[in-house]
Amino acid sequence: MFKKNSFYDFAYRRFTRNRLAVIGFAVTLFFVIMALFAPLIAPHEPSEFFFVEGQNVYDKYAAPSSEHLLGTDSLGRDVFSRLVYGARVTMMVALLAVSISTVIGTVIGLLSGYFGKIIDNIFMRLVDIVISFPVLFLLISISTIMDPSIWIVIFAIGFVSWTSTARLVRAEVLRVKELDYIAAARACGTSNLKIIVKHILPNILAPIMVQVTIGTAQAILMEASLSFLGVGVQQPTPSWGNMLMDAQKLLVLRDMPWIWIPPGVVNLLLVLAIYFVGDGLRDAFDSRQ
Amino acid sequence: MAEIKDVKRDNTLLSVEGLKVHFPVREGILRKKQIGVVKAVDGLDFSIRSNETFGLVGESGCGKSTTGRAILRLIESTEGSIYYKDKNLTKMTQKEMMPLRRDLQMIFQDPYASLNPRQPVIDIISDPLIAHSMISKSEKQDKVAQLMELVGLNPRFMNRFPHEFSGGQRQRIGIARSLALNAKFIVCDEPIAALDVSIQAQVINLLQDIQDKLGLTYLFIAHDLSVVRHISDRIAVMYLGKIVEITGKKELFQNPQHMYTKTLLSAVPIADPAKERKRTRIITEGEVPSPLHKPQGCAFSSRCPYAKKICREQEPELKKTSEEHWTACWEVQ
């Protein structure tokens, strides 16, 4: 799969030897497939309302049956179908948010670490400012001012979570840029851009990849908590977070576990699986072993 | 100083005049106050002749590596000038340096840190060629194979990664990279200090062979006199950012004048048990002073057994004591 005996070849071999990481990867893959093939798996449309037979009333809070595997929710929608489609939304939000935060974090970390001095100072103070943002408060204000949409959630998560990536990348750059092969490249007259792209970035890619997996897990959790509070993904779009909203009612929480246990469990499973993958990657990339 | 310049000026490839590299030491959180200066290199004068190996010796921290890096403009110098042929390198912008970088190259001490671990050998060696757009993609393989053969590596291994080679082989890769642009002047920054003793001789011989073949000039930095003795034509001894003695290799070993040189020489083991037993070492007292707080006068005065009043008050200049021999010591002058 990788060039023989390259760093990634060794890492791949170490990763596959880590049982927990492989299980985590399999579980993650399972959810990814579920998200990709949602229309084939889900028995119903996620926003389809069901009525009590012969009556003009929503069939809400129906217990699990052969018709509705996991019952129906407060508006008479099929919970299982929403769960399957929710995987799509949850993963899309997490992956896009992480892409945004990784790009911003890596670029800022590289510039900050490589050029140092005033650039470093400006960017690191910016990181301090962003870290001290009250995210929840910010999102609640944004969603009251603007029309809430899934994109706001994605950008909001992306723009507040790049800071740890930036700090990580900066620290790695500081370590790598003093090595002799960078001096050798400079002695050959290699441009700064080429040094960063060809010599620094490939050597700090491993920790960035670990950060991406952990960041994805954190983005999923963030989306869930935001949606649970009603400022994240909005109805009728299903997400694992806003499916938990029903659990805010005591009646549901007490008597109708089929509505809130499944989204909670899949959320937990996916986050845990991704964390295992992240841990596995970190161990695989640690060449001291 | 003028004396150094006039010697065979026509044959000089690189000369360093009054080179100083100072690093400010700052402290404080909001307003960083400069609390001192580390004078890593504090006024160097020497010239290197075409096709010779100029040894630069001194203990760690005396500024030899800094000197090498300052010549290649990897570290900016604070003062002084570096002439390569007739061009003053210190006055050039990095852009103007570009064409000169083909001529001036470097070999590093640690063969594990000097090669990018994510690049296969073919990319490492061809990197400088690509930076100067001197080859096309199709020529790359041939050129790299040629360079690898030159340094005694099998071109079959060009797609391997650095960690698949031994220390000596890695150092050969570093040498091949420095030769890629047809360099004329190479700074060898302790190229064998990190290698096993059995490999050291091989690399030294390789460096000498290449020098003969390609007509290279070396600035050979080392902390080990016995190595320098083998490879160098002339040797400069450095102490705390200054040159204390420059002379030909034979002269240095037979007639050392500076007390510091004598001390260094007495530390070189002799490969003959009978003589080795009789070798007397000159042990200097104390430690090397911190380059932050250098002693007044002669830098070595704090450790020199013959230090007089003048040594502690005035700094001796590098003066010609005999043909091809300069020493900075009041005792000798």
Model-derived segments and spans:
Chain A
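Gly/Trp-centered helix-boundary motif
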Residues: M1-T102, T106, L110-L111, K117-I118, ...
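Transmembrane alpha-helix boundary and packing residues in multipass membrane permease domains
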Residues: F31, L110, L139-T144, V153, ...
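Generic hydrophobic transmembrane alpha-helix motif, especially the helices
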Residues: L69, D73, I100-G105, L110-R175, ...
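Short hydrophobic alpha-helical segments within the ABC transporter permease transmembrane module
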Residues: R82-V84, L126, V169, V173, ...
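Transmembrane alpha-helices
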Residues: R88-I104, L193-S225, I274
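Glycine-rich helix-loop "coupling/hinge" segments at transmembrane-helix boundaries
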Residues: S143-I145, I157, V173, M222-V266
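Transmembrane helix boundary and interhelical loop/hinge segments in multi-pass membrane proteins
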Residues: E172-Y181, G280-R288
